[in-house]
Amino acid sequence: MLKSFKTEINPSEEQKVKIHKTIGTCRFIYNFYLAHNKELYNNGEKFMSSNRFRVWLNNEYLSEHPEYSWIKEAYSKAVIQSVNNGQTAFTRFFNHESAFPKFKKKGRSDVKMYFVKNNPKDCRCERHRINIPSLGWVRIKEKGYIPTTKDGYVVKSGTVSMKADRYYVSVLVEISDNKIADNSNAGIGIDLGLKDFAIVSNGKTYKNINKSARLKKLEKQLIREQRCLSRKYENLKKGEVTQRANIQKQKLKVQKLHHKIDNIRTDYINKTIAEIVKTKPSYITIEDLNVNGMMKNRHLSKAVASQKFYEFRTKLQIKCNENGIELRIVDRWYPSSKTCHCCGAIKKDLKLSDRIFKCSCGYVEDRDLNAALNLRDAITYEVA
């Protein structure tokens, strides 16, 4: 099976220039593909697929516009993948799965440099470095994290990305799937929430990391740095003396703080999932949360976004597949919080402010733990 590994790299200055050029070219080609298809649509012409666009770009457009010859200097596979990403975005729009594709803006969009293994010498990986096409050998900061070629592992493809002045490589490695699952323990239910991040039916509670003193301090620092950046932009608009280099420095400070906060949240999710999976349950049941609907509530949207529920579900599903654990998804309309775990009665007048569930049968329990118990014993579900 294929497994992904992502780690930070330490490229040289020359390699950094190549990464910046390739990512910039990929962003330009992606935007050009969107703009060209919009123009074709306005003229009443047929939609151009990624294959037709590449033929038209190489055989017609670049020969007529030599000023864009710098496009050919970038790694060809990365450029091809950016066009394919554009077609995927249109396909999702045509299938009513997402909104109309948006242009990618420099510094604000997640654009990556894609690479693939074309010959045996490409994508070789050693303990402390990896060979990336068009870049050569690049040093890895976390030594030994990616399985090495010497041990018989094969890197199929990967991407190089940049975030807050730090560079990362993500690779797909072909590994053998020979794990024998030993999940003899009872199943568990997990209720996700805002007061606490996750409540497990076995009584374990994972606190909301966003309420920790460390994150609160970082968020206050982020507000101060954002305010400072806004003042610099305002001074620039007014015509006052403000060096653009100082704006870029301040912008980088803000990006690094965003990145640090995001890394803390992601690390907490990874550790939570690892701890849950180590208990070796026979199955795990979670609720299909309507995150998009929750985000529409302006009072809760920030708190919901910071919890990263979708990332938790995605990573939990991957870990369950790797360890042979059945992941059950209960419908979002299942009244897990309002149902009494003791007698099965539904308390329709339960409010969000009611933190203790009290039933007429005499059953009293924390509402989140009651929901986790109901999810564990749910009969109607789908296997992810």
Regions picked out by a protein language model, each given a short descriptive name:
Residues 1-79:
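Gly/serine-rich nucleotide phosphate-binding loop at the start of the catalytic core
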Residues 34-41, 90, 94-101, 175:
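Long, hydrophobic, amphipathic alpha-helical segments used as structural scaffolds
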Residues 52-163:
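Acidic carboxylate diad motif detector
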Residues 33, 78, 82-93, 369-379, ...:
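Stable alpha-helical structural segments in soluble proteins, enriched in small hydrophobic residues
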Residues 4-8, 137, 157, 187:
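Well-ordered beta-strand positions in beta-sheet-rich domains
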Residues 3, 148-151, 163-384:
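Positively charged, helix-rich recognition surfaces that bind polyanionic ligands
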Residues 6-8, 85, 129, 168-170, ...:
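Beta-strand secondary-structure signal
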